[in-house]
Amino acid sequence: MVVINGYSFKTQQLLTQQPDHSQLTQFVQPQSQSTHSVHPGPSPGQQQAGGSMTMPSSSTGKGKREWDINDAIVPHVPDQEFDEFNEWSDGHVRHIYSLHNEEAKKHISGWAMRNTNNHNVNILKKSCLGVLVCSQHCTLPNGSKINLRPAICDKARRKQEGKACPNKSCRGGRLEIKPCRGHCGYPVTHFWRHSGNAIFFQAKGVHDHLRPDPKNSSVSKRAFGRVPLAGKSANGSVAKKSVIAGLVKQAKQQHSLISKVLKRPAVSNPLAHTALDIYQYNACGKCAGYSHCTCSYLDDSTTARSHQLSQSSNYGTNSWPLSGSESSAPCETAANVFTVNHQHITYNYPIYHATPAAATAAPSKSPSLPYACSISELAAYQQSSSGNSFAMGVPVHGHTQCQAVAYDSSPQLATPEPEFINYSQIKHLGGGGGQEEISCKAEPGPTIKYNATVETQPYVEDNYDYYYSPKAEYEMQQHHHQQQQSHQQFGGNQTAGHHYYESSSGYNGVSYFDTGTTTAPGNTATGNGLEVGYGGYYDHYTSYEQQMAVAGGFATAGGSTAPTVAAPPGHPPPPPPPPTLTYHHHHHHHLHHPAAATGLAPSVTH
């Protein structure tokens, strides 16, 4: 048996009936034409080894080859029978190219053909992408239409679509894809197959669009920017200038960033100045405004005031070398500084003090926010704790002049930002919704919301929960407590509210804890009282604190406690209710004082 184009024939029929072979070819010819191929009929063939056949050309030219690209066995073609390469193959055609033909090996085509998945790995299948045309169907000066070759890459082709028409006379035209639908509504398909010494090519379908312009045509180059429309030199210079401008901008941005990074250690280094410098800066009452201190607080001649020199004995063996210093810089009285910030005190973290310069930029991690409170508040309140107290923000030394201090949404700090901060228990004030401005000229004191959680800092973000002071400041607070227990706060009760225990940090002192039971007056009804989640971490202490507060006669119902008016100068102030204290076994030393709700400032202020 011999298989020819899928038909089986007996060997005896081919060998013994040579005169009848013409009838065989006539039988095969209609079958081949019924497959929609336009090939001429084969000539009398010769049997080849392996079952393939070579059919030489007839006297009128090359004969039609009876093969299909999907055949299991394709015919063997002699070298003299190879076709010349055709770049614009159109219609149902078959070509056999030499294995050494460079164009055939590259599968080149004038049409925009892209690779398509095929189930047969031995056959390369390509489909036509169509042509790029103008949306306005404009006509070139030579009378032709815009027909540009689409890019094979999907990304590049998407960039081509929507570009302006390269025709100079076109107005508003855009390039768009006209897809190929020449093969039964589908793109025309090309097949390539390498077999033996030949490359077989077969096309199915007729292109229903014009031939696209080649890539190197002038219209194509002008359309896709390979040749500038306004001249090569002008466009090139503009592009070069834009690139240079972009590089200069990047360099400036990097330079500014580097300068900020280099300046930051000099500003925020917590150990840049000594403790004496920082204390002198904090003690300065001359600059009670909201900006940088203008005093030479780093000058050796400008030291603490005389009323602070009396406290130098408290700083022996500590980091505050105040002994032997004299006061030479006259500062304003501290009566015009009356903001008191009670802050949490924690000793189980390293304690650092930022530099005074950092106090203006560090509080909210943003240099754009102003520094809202002078550090001299600390010294002002230390002076008041030696026998005077502030009631609801009204100055006590008889000063009734207008104070240019207002509580706004900007951060207010009594001390610079520490190095380590626990952000888990921050208390939000909602952007200063309950803040009021300080009135002037002996008017009733405004409602200043503050307690042990530094409520004068209305942060929207979670920042600055705890503020730390060194051991020396805390011992100074303890010293003031011991001096003033008999005549100011506790009315002779020397042991009222004092719980001593030894912590792991070596501190033996008072354990103050704020459970959030002291609500600022006038703020509970307005929704600016203590938030629900504030005391959640210490819920087991809250009930005890509330019981102690009720037992001590401190009523928080309604949140409106009558403000206490300051006593005239020379008279001791009325004693505030005893503080509510809680003894607990972790190393967070917190201040809880019910006087914070009434505006009475306790003696511990750091």
UniProtKB/Swiss-Prot annotation:
GO molecular function, one term: DNA-binding transcription factor activity, RNA polymerase II-specific
Tissues showing expression: Expressed in glial lineages within embryonic procephalic mesoderm. Expression is highest in hemocyte primordia and longitudinal and nerve root ganglia.
A Pfam family that the UniProt record links to this protein: GCM
Annotated segments matching region Disordered: 20-65, 475-501, 561-606
Residue ranges flagged as DNA-binding region: 65-224
Sequence ranges of Polar residues compositional bias: 20-37, 490-501
InterPro entries: GCM (IPR039791), GCM_dom_sf (IPR036115), GCM_large (IPR043020), GCM_small (IPR043021), Tscrpt_reg_GCM (IPR003902)
Cellular location(s): Nucleus
Compositionally biased intervals (Basic residues): 583-593
Main location: nucleus
Biased composition (Low complexity): 44-61, 594-606
Top-rank lineage group of the source organism: Eukaryota
Cellular component per GO, a single term: nucleus
Amino acid composition bias (Pro residues), ranges on this chain: 569-580
Gene Ontology BP terms: dendrite morphogenesis; embryonic crystal cell differentiation; glial cell development; glial cell differentiation; gliogenesis; hemocyte differentiation; negative regulation of crystal cell differentiation; neuron differentiation
Keywords tagged on the record: Developmental protein, DNA-binding, Nucleus, Transcription, Transcription regulation
Record function comment: Transcription factor with a minor role promoting glial cell differentiation and a more significant role in hematocyte differentiation. Gcm2, together with gcm, is required for the proliferation of plasmatocyte precursors, the expression of Croquemort protein, and the ability of plasmatocytes to convert into macrophages.
Protein name in the entry: Transcription factor glial cells missing 2
Gene: gcm2
